[in-house]
Design a protein with these regions (language model features):
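Short acidic, glycine-rich surface-loop motifs adjacent to enzyme active sites
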Residues: 5-9, 121-132
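Subtilisin-like serine protease catalytic core
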Residues: 29-43, 49-61, 69-114, 130-131
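Protease zymogen maturation seam
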Residues: 1-41, 53-54
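Predominant activation on well-ordered alpha-helical scaffold segments within soluble catalytic domains
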Residues: 83, 117-124
Length: 132
């Protein structure tokens, strides 16, 4: 190998509160028009996800590329917020959509590009099996 680029990092810019999600993204229009996330699966690369009553039955798969844990967790909150925007029962854009969550950012919202690349590679290699 003649050249290898240095590792780069990603960092989240701000924090958002989950209770504001429905109105900040106009999700009420989704419900008004009868849309849902039924039969939809979404891959989320973020800080992880907490189990939450609004996400009951939505979290189909969790993989931790930061700490190697096997159970769902989110030590920052951003990933859970994103998952809520996507598929939460009362506030999501695609309520009930299946979530395949890949933790690539740490408690500070920072992550190595290589972790994101590993997650994307895993998704590509397993998309048919995971149905995403």
């Amino acid at each position: 190998m003649s050249y290898c680029e240095n590792e780069s990092y990603t960092k989240l810019k701000n924090k958002i509160i989950m209770k504001n999600a429905k109105y900040s993204i106009n999700a009420n229009l989704v419900y008004k028009n009868g849309y849902s996330g039924k039969n939809v699966n979404i891959a989320v690369l973020d800080t992880g996800v907490f189990k939450h009553k609004q996400l009951d039955g939505c979290i189909k798969h969790f993989m931790d590329f930061v700490g190697g844990k096997e159970t769902c967790y989110d030590d920052n909150g951003h990933g859970t917020h994103v998952c809520g925007i996507l598929s939460a029962a009362d506030i999501g854009m695609a309520p009930g959509a299946g979530l395949y969550v890949f933790k690539v950012l740490d408690y500070l919202g920072m992550g190595q590009t290589s972790d994101s690349i590993r997650a994307l590679k895993y998704i590509k290699e397993n998309c048919v099996r995971l149905n995403i």
